[in-house]
Amino acid sequence: MQCFAEMTPADLSLGLNGGLAALIGADGQLLAGAAPAPEEKHVLLPLPLGERALIFGAGHIARSLVPLLKTINFRPVVYDCRPECVNQVNFPDADQVIVGDFDHIADSLALLPDDYIVIMTNAHSHDFEVELQALQADHAYVGVIGSAKKTASVNARLRERGVTDDRLAVVHTPIGTAIKAVTPAEIAVSIAGEMIYVRALRREGGQEAHHGCPMH
């Protein structure tokens, strides 16, 4: 459906007298179904949209991360340059799989302000190019996998390309929460945990998150 593909808000119109359901965009435009008759009573139910998570790199961690993100109401999109890796067979839970050039993401995918961007490709050079493009604008979350040594090396190259320290400071790297994760599944859990926390902060206006959980 258009609203889910473009991440635009929409309402579900349900006729109280047995009329057909319709999908109404935020601007009042009919997106799907039959428009309710003027005299018909109906109720509008807002449709929640999960945040879009862009996973750059279709490796083992991504295979563990995508189904996990799906269960916590993210909308995972997997992007890789290798068609044998990025496909619906390997990622049945992904909302979308994209085969594209890491150096020219905009040719295949628009990066949006509310996107959660996870960078863990099969090469440091690809990670660098994706991070460089991601830092050209603000996003909800940018996380990059890698050691402290790799991060320092990449940051030095990014500075050479004009990326400021203020921009570098928004990147979560090494990615994930500090839970001593080792296996791909454990690393996926640590990444998902960090994304949940950032999402909670954003929903609370950037203030410290209060989860109502005895563990926090």
Predicted regions and their residues:
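Adenosine-phosphate binding glycine-rich loop
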Residues: 145-216
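Short amphipathic alpha-helix with an adjacent loop that forms part of the alpha/beta core around
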Residues: 103-113
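ADP-ribose/adenylate-binding Rossmann-like module
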Residues: 79, 116, 121, 132-157
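Short phosphate-binding/catalytic loops that engage adenosine nucleotides
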Residues: 74, 139, 163
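Short glycine-rich, flexible loops that bind phosphorylated cofactors or substrates
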Residues: 125-127
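Short amphipathic alpha-helical segments
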Residues: 66-68, 90-91, 110-111, 129-133, ...
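Conserved SAM-binding strand-loop segment of SAM-dependent methyltransferases
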Residues: 95-101
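Segments forming oxygen-rich coordination pockets for charged ligands
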Residues: 1-81, 85-95, 112-116, 150, ...
